[in-house]
Structures are given as C-alpha cells and as structure tokens.
Amino acid sequence: MCIRDNDTVMPGVPFEVWSQKMRACKTKLEFQKTFCYGLLWKLAKEVTDGLTLDHTALPADKSAAYTYISNHRDIILDSGFLSILLVDQGMDTVEIAIGDNLLVYPWIKKFVRVNKSFIVLRALTMRQMLEASARMSRYMHYTISEKKQSIWIAQREGRAKDSNDRTQDSVLKMLAIGGEGDVIDRLMAVSYTHLRAHETLAN
C-alpha cells in the first residue's frame, strides 16, 4: 500500500490534523487503513476498469497467513491493490518483497517498511546472494508460521517482457531453503497461492 502528499490523501485537511492522525496509528495496518486504503481505491477507479478478487480457493479461516506469488506490472500498485481487496474480505494486508534497487532515496526505504515491506538485496556476489536468499527464506517462513502474516512476492525479478510469466526457478529455490522437513514440506509451510493479474488499464 502507498501514500503521497496530504493534499492527495486527505484533501483540504490541515497538515496538523493529518499529522495527529498519523501519530494516532499504533500499528502498520491502522496506518494503511487510514492513509492508503482510500487512496488506492480512488486510484483504482480512475485508472482501471475495476478490481476483483476470487478468494474461493482460500480456506474459510480469514486469520490464516499465505504467500501470494504473482506476476506484476507495478510492484507497489499490484501488491497494494491485492491488500485493499483482502481488507474488503475482512483479511489482513500483506508484507511485500521489494528490491533495494527501487529505494533510490533514504526516505523511501523508511516508508516502505512502514507499509509492511521487506527488502530484497540485489547486485550481490554469488556467495552473498545465497546468504541473502537463505536469510530471506527464513524470514518468510517465520512471518507465515510465527507472525501469522501473509506475504506477497513477485514470481520473477522484473516485469515479463515476452509474455513469459513462468515462475523463476530461483524464487522456488529461495522458498525451499528455509523451514523444516524436505523440499515439499518447506513449500507447503509457506502456504503459497499463485495469482495472475487481470486488470485492464483504462485509456
């Protein structure tokens, strides 16, 4: 989920009031519902033909945590749209895996963490990449099994430019590094759910 300036989020509201509302938020979910939910629905109505979520494949327990894996066209908006649709179903928003190559300013790094994002390190050596993948896998398993918090992760690095939306092998290998048991047990532990985007942008 995301946020811009206070005139966009709360038009006509003085900054002092906006600041008080922000300080009143005690959790990341409260922050997202206060500042991001309405903005994202407003944006969706302006630039898409509509958003829908087929949640029938999910168990009835809305408090359960899942790993959502999908293609993406805009990593912030796609995961944000998923979150507001989940909120409408009475479910929690998702933590988002976001590459550090997108954190071009220090304030962006702080802001995405407020919005339940965790950082995926890029431009690493092979050894560093293996260590980072193992660390992230352990965190994702912990987030699903201990924090009971759902996660969204792109199925491949970058956008698919040739209509090839197959999940990158390295993503599945990363998920299987952490956790206990054999590879199948580890993948089942993160309760992964494959999604595919069908939004059509309005002209």
Residue ranges and their predicted role:
Residues 60-125, 129, 176-186:
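Catalytic core of membrane glycerolipid acyltransferases/transacylases, capturing the structured
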Residues 58, 100, 158-160:
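Conserved short loop/turn motifs at secondary-structure junctions
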Residues 123-130, 159-165:
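Flexible, glycine/proline-enriched loop segments at strand-loop-helix junctions
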Residues 94, 131-134, 138:
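Basic/hydrophobic alpha-helical interface regions
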